[in-house]
């Protein structure tokens, strides 16, 4: 194993240790938010937000690392980026275009968008893990990150559902979320087309994880710290 790979793994382990230690200090370890069922669970809104912000940041870091590794190994000189622009399955969601727009968006809308994004990634993340496992010569780093992201996405969704319930008690979150239909592209026998589909999916995951991270930090600042952050 070369020094560059060792350095990348060391950085990821350090980040994971920092996140784990922070969560342990707050009594919110990286397990389901309510391991004994919602009826036995009392977690403060501040703790829920602290956990969610750290997990979303971790997911975005993993997504960026996974995309960069795939790009270097499979996409150099292929022009995949031109096909990936504006082709995400979540593009139909009316998300703010930048941080300034997000700051002007009502917190209920931002929370609904986060929930929609998280739910829309459950299925593609499951299939991403499955298909990467079957990819010949796929780096272990890509698979390990995909597995972690799938697990953390579920935990973050659970936490966001609890946050929604505390911030908007009695409200029902029933907005439909985009359905992913890209599995056939990940399974095509055309190698370039298959790699292009993987590239597009990872590009979209990095984009959406960045949005979720940004929206969550804004909500945390607005709701928990009354914009004093």
Curated annotation (Swiss-Prot):
Chain segments annotated as coiled-coil in the UniProt record: none
Pfam families: Hormone_1
Entries under InterPro entries matching the protein: 4_helix_cytokine-like_core, Somatotropin/Prolactin, Somatotropin_CS
Subcellular location, record wording: Secreted
UniProtKB keywords: Disulfide bond, Hormone, Lactation, Phosphoprotein, Secreted, Signal
Cystine residue pairs: 34-41, 88-204, 221-229
A GO CC annotation given for this chain: extracellular space
Residues with Phosphoserine modification: 56, 64, 120
Signal peptide residues on this chain, from the entry's feature table: 1-30
GO biological process terms, semicolon-separated: female pregnancy; lactation; negative regulation of apoptotic process; peptide hormone secretion; positive regulation of cell population proliferation; positive regulation of fatty acid biosynthetic process; positive regulation of gene expression; positive regulation of lactation
Highest taxon above the source species: Eukaryota
GO-annotated molecular function: hormone activity; prolactin receptor binding
Family that this chain belongs to: Belongs to the somatotropin/prolactin family.
Record text on subunit structure and interactions: Interacts with PRLR.
Function (record text): Prolactin acts primarily on the mammary gland by promoting lactation.
Protein name per UniProt: Prolactin
UniProt lineage: Eukaryota, Metazoa, Chordata, Craniata, Vertebrata
Underlying gene: PRL
């Amino acid at each position: 194993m070369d020094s560059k790979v060792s350095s990348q793994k060391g950085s990821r382990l350090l980040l994971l240790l920092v996140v784990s230690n922070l969560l342990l200090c707050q009594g919110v370890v990286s397990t389901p938010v309510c391991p004994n069922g919602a009826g036995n669970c009392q977690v403060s809104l501040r703790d829920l937000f602290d956990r969610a912000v750290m997990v979303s940041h971790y997911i975005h870091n993993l997504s960026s690392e996974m995309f960069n590794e795939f790009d270097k190994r499979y996409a150099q000189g292929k022009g995949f980026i031109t096909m990936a622009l504006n082709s995400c399955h979540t593009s139909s969601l009316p998300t703010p275009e930048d941080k300034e727009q997000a700051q002007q968006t009502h917190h209920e809308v931002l929370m609904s968008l986060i929930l929609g994004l998280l739910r829309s990634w459950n299925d593609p993340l499951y299939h991403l893990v499955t298909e990467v496992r079957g990819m010949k010569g796929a780096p272990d780093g890509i698979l390990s990150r995909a597995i972690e992201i799938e697990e953390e996405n579920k935990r973050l969704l659970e936490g966001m559902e609890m946050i929604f319930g505390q911030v908007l008690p009695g409200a029902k979150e029933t907005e439909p979320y985009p359905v992913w239909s890209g599995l056939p592209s990940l399974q095509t026998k055309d190698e370039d087309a298959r790699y292009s589909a993987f590239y597009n999916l990872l590009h979209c995951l990095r984009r959406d994880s960045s949005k979720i991270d940004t929206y969550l930090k804004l909500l945390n600042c607005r709701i928990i710290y009354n914009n004093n952050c």
